[in-house]
């Protein structure tokens, strides 16, 4: 049984963890909404079908599995436009700044970069760049869900409707 001091300490730790999760969800939400702004341009440039919109709309849904190669191509195009990647992989500095621009503090921004870097290293070395990026994105999504940083489907839908 916990004494009063232990109980207070436990409550403080739980509260601080909760407060860390909510702002992180906001960061991921804001990053995602900004990330997809160039989607129409990428679809036009790469002649991608409108069917990939569903993958972007439902990306953070835990039950949605992204398998469409075209979605990987769009993610690569968007990442390039935002200068988050180079020919050799993730641009750590630009990605760190991108996260900070969307509300992340230094710690959260670095954790996002670390997750992306870890996922980049973890995916198989596929010859098809679009499929490799798709696997990278799926890994990142899974890691964000483990941290409970994924924005809810309801919040994302409301934000997307508000932008229309």
From Swiss-Prot:
Subunit (UniProt): Monomer and disulfide-linked dimers.
Disulfide bonds: 42-77, 73-130, 119-139
Tissues where the protein occurs: Antenna.
Gene Ontology BP term (one): response to pheromone
MF terms in GO: pheromone binding
Transmembrane segments: none
Domain of life the protein comes from: Eukaryota
Gene: PBP
Family of the protein in this entry: Belongs to the PBP/GOBP family.
Name under which the protein is recorded: Pheromone-binding protein 1
Pfam families tied to this protein: PBP_GOBP
Keyword Signal belongs to the record: yes
Function comment: This major soluble protein in olfactory sensilla of male moths serves to solubilize the extremely hydrophobic pheromone molecules such as bombykol and to transport pheromone through the aqueous lymph to receptors located on olfactory cilia.
Keywords: Disulfide bond, Pheromone response, Pheromone-binding, Signal, Transport
InterPro entries the record matches: Odorant/phero-bd_Lep, PBP/GOBP, PBP_GOBP_sf
Keyword Signal annotated: yes
Signal peptide per UniProt: 1-23
């Amino acid at each position: 049984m916990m004494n009063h001091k232990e109980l207070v300490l436990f409550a403080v730790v739980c509260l601080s963890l909760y407060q860390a999760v909510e702002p992180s969800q906001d960061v991921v939400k804001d990053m995602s909404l900004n990330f997809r702004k160039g989607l129409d341009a990428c679809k036009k440039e790469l002649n991608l079908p409108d069917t990939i919109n569903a993958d972007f709309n439902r990306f953070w849904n835990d039950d949605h599995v992204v398998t469409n190669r075209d979605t990987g191509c769009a993610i690569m195009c968007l990442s390039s436009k935002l200068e988050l990647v180079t020919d050799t992989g993730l641009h750590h500095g630009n990605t760190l700044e991108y996260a900070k621009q969307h509300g992340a503090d230094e710690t959260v921004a670095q954790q996002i970069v670390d997750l992306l870097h870890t996922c980049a290293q973890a995916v198989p070395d596929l010859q098809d760049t679009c499929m490799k990026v798709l696997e990278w994105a799926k890994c990142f999504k899974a890691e964000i869900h483990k941290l409970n940083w994924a924005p809810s489907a309801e919040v994302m839908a409301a934000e997307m409707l508000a932008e229309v």
